[in-house]
UniProtKB/Swiss-Prot annotation:
It comes from Phenylobacterium zucineum (strain HLK1). Disulfide bonds: none annotated. InterPro entries: NADH_Q_OxRdtase_suD, NADH_UbQ_OxRdtase_49kDa_CS, NDH1_su_D/H, NiFe-Hase_large. Transmembrane segments: none annotated. NDH-1 shuttles electrons from NADH, via FMN and iron-sulfur (Fe-S) centers, to quinones in the respiratory chain. The immediate electron acceptor for the enzyme in this species is believed to be ubiquinone. Couples the redox reaction to proton translocation (for every two electrons transferred, four hydrogen ions are translocated across the cytoplasmic membrane), and thus conserves the redox energy in a proton gradient. Belongs to the complex I 49 kDa subunit family. It is a peripheral membrane protein. NDH-1 is composed of 14 different subunits. Subunits NuoB, C, D, E, F, and G constitute the peripheral sector of the complex. It is found in: Cell inner membrane. Keywords: Cell inner membrane, Cell membrane, Membrane, NAD, Quinone, Translocase, Transport, Ubiquinone. This is NADH-quinone oxidoreductase subunit D.
Length: 411
């Protein structure tokens, strides 16, 4: 036998006498009832085998015309609409809207009101990240983290309820401050929770951070470079996971963030795993901020709402003694206050990214136009670009790392 090899058979489909078949692309619907869709998302996926070639997001299934509805209501009656946008962390959205109106009116918020706002913004951040991190783990097969995460979320929901009376749609922030002061017992309970929470985070990290399966499903999946993050208009963890140190709490401080000590976690690779690590570390930093707020709230006292009865209602006792207070109360709850004509943009570092409100006033008691800049919207529009070339199983991992809630996308 010589070392020569036999000539290869010609590359012809009919060598074996088989009919020639064309490989066709396969289209499937992902959602809107899929548990990994995180809401009413419908994705039409075009697959070549198991490789994703195209993703077409269909949105609008939760559209309620929020921006248009706001044009028919006085300013004070439009605050509850913001609770229903990103309903995982409602108070952060209220904050942006109140900031916009305060800019128009030139209202100064008392220090204690700013402290409470800062505290509850960070509670919202932890509520959001706990839900995102644990459900992302569930999407790739881990069932224990959601149980532990929801136990802590329940405690935070009770803090919401003790401050505002509602677990979810709080309607707690007001133009000029917050609706009512926090009792010292509540502040102490939040402080005690801050002491215990890092241990819970350690337990959750012990389950999934170095888990081989979790890393295989997230490392080098959905990579976003710095340039791509900026080009797509990303914000929040989506840019910080790619290594861009952009956080509005530092770069454009509002409330009392300029007086707080905290670090901004950054990723290196810009993949799903780095975004997960950023969120885990952000929860630790939020706990630090909450602890600082609790210490200051326990040591100080003062008003939580601006003492201007053209904007904030007078107290009940005052209304029984003063006719002016009664008139102010009546005018506030029937007509509301008027803002000077002009336009203003206010934004906050919401858990999902930069949540902005562009408010146009025509001098009446209602917004002429209120444009909401939802951080999840530019993230979702990049789904097609981020998923191309990935496997079908990676779609849910990428979607989970984007952190999408449909209240704010469809509005």
């Amino acid at each position: 036998m010589t070392g020569q090899t036999a000539p290869a058979a010609p590359e012809d489909a009919n060598v074996l006498g088989l009919p020639e078949t064309k490989v066709r692309k396969f289209n499937i619907n992902f959602g809107p009832q899929h548990p990994a869709a995180h809401g009413v998302l419908r994705l039409v996926l075009e697959l070549d085998g198991e490789v994703v070639e195209r993703v077409d997001p269909h949105i609008g299934l939760l559209h309620r015309g929020t921006e248009k509805l706001m044009e028919a209501r006085p300013y004070a009656q439009t605050i509850p609409y913001f609770d229903r946008l990103d309903y995982v962390a409602p108070m952060n959205q209220e904050h942006a809207y109140c900031l916009a109106i305060e800019k128009l009116l030139g209202v100064e918020v008392p220090v204690r009101g700013l402290l409470i706002r800062t505290l509850y913004d960070e509670i919202g951040r932890i509520l959001n990240h706990l839900l995102n991190v644990t459900t992302q783990a569930m999407d790739v097969g881990a069932l224990t983290p959601p149980l532990w995460g929801f136990e802590e979320r329940e405690k935070l929901m009770i803090f919401y309820e003790r401050a505002s009376g509602a677990r979810l749609h709080a309607n707690y922030y007001r133009v000029g401050g917050v609706r009512q002061d926090l009792p010292p017992e509540l502040v102490q309970d939040i402080s005690d929770w801050c002491d215990a929470f890092p241990k819970i985070l350690d337990d959750i990290e012990g389950l999934i951070t170095d888990n081989r399966i979790f890393k295989q499903r997230n490392v080098d999946i959905g990579v976003v470079t710095k340039e791509e993050a900026i080009a797509w208009g990303f914000s929040g963890v989506m840019v910080r996971g790619s290594g861009i140190p952009w956080d509005l709490r530092r770069s454009q401080p509002y409330a009392l963030y300029s007086e707080m000590e905290f670090d901004i976690p950054l990723g290196v690779n810009g993949d799903c795993y780095d975004r997960y690590l950023c969120r885990m570390q952000e929860m630790r930093e939020s706990t630090k901020i909450m602890k600082q707020c609790c210490e200051r709230l326990l040591k100080t006292s003062g008003p939580v709402l601006v003492d201007d009865h053209k904007v904030s209602p007078p107290r009940r006792g005052e209304m029984k003694r003063s006719m002016e207070a009664l008139i102010h109360h009546f005018k506030l709850y029937t007509e509301g206050y008027r803002t000077p004509p002009g336009d203003v943009y206010a934004c906050v570092e919401a858990p999902k990214g930069e949540f902005g409100v562009y408010l146009v006033s025509n001098g009446t008691n209602k917004p002429y136009r209120c444009k909401i800049r939802a951080p999840g919207y530019p993230h979702l529009q990049a789904m097609d670009w981020m998923n191309r070339g990935h496997m079908l199983a990676d779609v849910s991992a990428i979607l989970g790392s984007l952190d999408i809630v449909f209240g704010e996308i469809d509005r």
